Design a protein with these regions (language model features):
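Conserved beta-strand hairpin/beta-sheet module of binuclear metal-dependent hydrolase folds
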Residues: 45-98, 224-237
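Bacterial N-terminal signal peptides
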Residues: 8-19
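Bacterial N-terminal signal peptides that target proteins for export
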Residues: 1-8
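Active-site metal-binding motif and surrounding structural segment of the metallo-beta-lactamase
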Residues: 43, 48-51, 72-74, 85-134
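Active-site neighborhood of phospho(di)ester-bond hydrolases with catalytic His/Asp-centered motifs
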Residues: 78-80, 101-113, 135-138, 233-236, ...
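Metallo-beta-lactamase
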Residues: 24-25, 50, 75, 82-84, 142-214, 260-272, ...
Length: 422
């Protein structure tokens, strides 16, 4: 194994959720779940979609899709999923279509659900010998190493926490991950890229013309692939799939600049593609349909950004901004692409504020606040003690006031992490 590949593979394994479960089968979804969320799960039913004569997308096996291009002289695999075992199942489905050899693999960006499953499709020996190329942006390997080396352990914890990875797949717990089925966490089989580029790359692979373009958005090293012969746009996560884009991800990330993301979406619109293949969710066909999805997505991101900046400059703090900035009905109702299955308006607003102004909101009390446990102890005493706090929390829960119930219980938990009632 190449030295950097070995390091990167270890680091990638640190950024995966600590546990994962299979997606909940449709027949096990009961009426207790939100009907819209139940309907959303159906977007990720396992299926290999044929988009054009030579382009296929495998949806529903794992969090990330895998796309296959059948070129005259061999196959080009776009992204590899997070799970080598699930990706082997996908490759078995592809083998029902063609027996051509794999000639190239493309990593659209450095996130684990797009690069970890590569050895389901190729071996290190094939890459080392030059039989197979691995194509990516020139910064991908540095991003893999930097993320894992610096914050890999905590990203793993936060990723598992934000995805609810320890919860069982039931109608009361987990159903889907918003952009796909629940993640399948496995050790990474990452192999380093052999061909990289900076801004754009027009090339011929396995007898087929391909155009690559760097379009920073959901990731700083995001690239898309365009097939001019049949006007197919493989949009990576610039168009993130059936959800409001997550301008901020709860697991933690560097600032995702909404202005840059909007510019990248406009670059995709300029292709006037007949087909679009995102790497999460189903493909979109028809030039007008592709244009509508891209335009509405860019309008949604632009609106959130512009209104946040507008009210930020009027002095509103993040807690005030999240109550002020709302998508208008024509955007909020654009199902599924602007619904809050993965990204949310409130999370995005806080990210934008922090990206421009940092953590300080202007209240001097926040410069040196009381430690959380000290604050909880004083507030619980002020409210009459633990029993009264928990009674109030229980009453709020029974009334459906779940946020207040959680906040009250949080004070008791800060005093005693093993408090079973809290």
């Amino acid at each position: 194994m190449f030295p950097l590949t070995r390091i990167a593979a270890v680091l990638l394994s640190l950024t995966l959720p600590l546990a994962s479960h299979a997606a909940l089968p449709d027949e096990q979804i009961s009426a207790s779940i939100n009907p819209e969320l139940a309907e959303h799960t159906k977007h990720f039913a396992q299926k290999v979609y044929k988009i054009a004569d030579n382009v296929y997308s495998a949806v529903g096996w794992q969090l990330g899709n895998v796309a296959m291009i059948e070129a005259p002289e061999g196959l080009i695999i776009i992204d590899t999923g997070e799970s080598v075992s699930e990706s082997r199942k996908i490759m078995a489905e592809f083998r029902k279509i063609t027996d051509k050899p794999v000639k190239a693999v493309v990593y659209t960006h450095f996130h684990p659900d797009h690069i970890n499953g590569v050895k389901a499709f190729v071996t290190e020996e094939q890459v080392r010998s030059g039989e197979v190329q691995i194509i990516a942006h020139e910064t991908l390997l540095a991003n893999v190493v930097a993320q894992g080396a610096l914050v890999g352990p905590i990203l793993s914890v936060r990723s598992g926490y934000s995805f609810g990875a320890a919860l069982p797949a039931t109608d009361h717990e987990q159903m889907n991950a918003g952009i796909g089925p629940l993640a399948k966490a496995e050790a990474s089989t990452f192999i380093a890229p052999t061909l990289t580029f900076k801004d754009k790359l027009d090339t011929r692979i396995a007898g087929l013309d391909l155009q690559f373009l760097h379009v920073p958005s959901e990731a700083p090293d995001e690239i898309i692939v365009y097939l001019p012969d049949n006007r197919v746009l493989i949009s990576a996560e610039v168009e993130q799939g059936p959800t409001l884009p997550n301008i901020h991800t709860l697991r933690g990330t560097k600032f995702r600049d909404p202005v840059v993301w909007v510019e990248s979406l406009d670059k995709l619109r300029a292709y006037r593609a007949e087909h679009m293949v995102p790497l999460h969710g189903r493909p979109v066909s028809g030039e007008q349909n592709v244009e509508e999805v891209l335009r509405m997505t860019r309008d949604g991101i632009a609106y959130i950004h512009d209104q946040t900046v507008r009210w930020m400059n009027k002095g509103l703090t993040p807690d005030e901004l999240v109550e002020k900035v709302k998508l208008p009905p024509h955007l909020a109702g654009y199902t599924p692409y602007l619904r809050e299955y993965y990204g949310t308006v409130k999370h995005s607003v806080r990210q934008i504020y922090n990206g421009y102004l940092g953590w300080f909101q202007g209240d001097p009390v926040d410069l040196d606040p009381l430690p959380p446990q000290d604050k909880a102890q004083r507030l619980v005493a002020l409210m009459g003690g633990r029993e009264k706090v928990l009674l109030a929390a229980g009453d709020a829960y029974l009334k459906g006031d779940y946020q207040w119930a959680a906040e009250l219980s949080g004070y008791a938990i800060r005093l005693d992490h093993d408090d079973p009632l809290a």
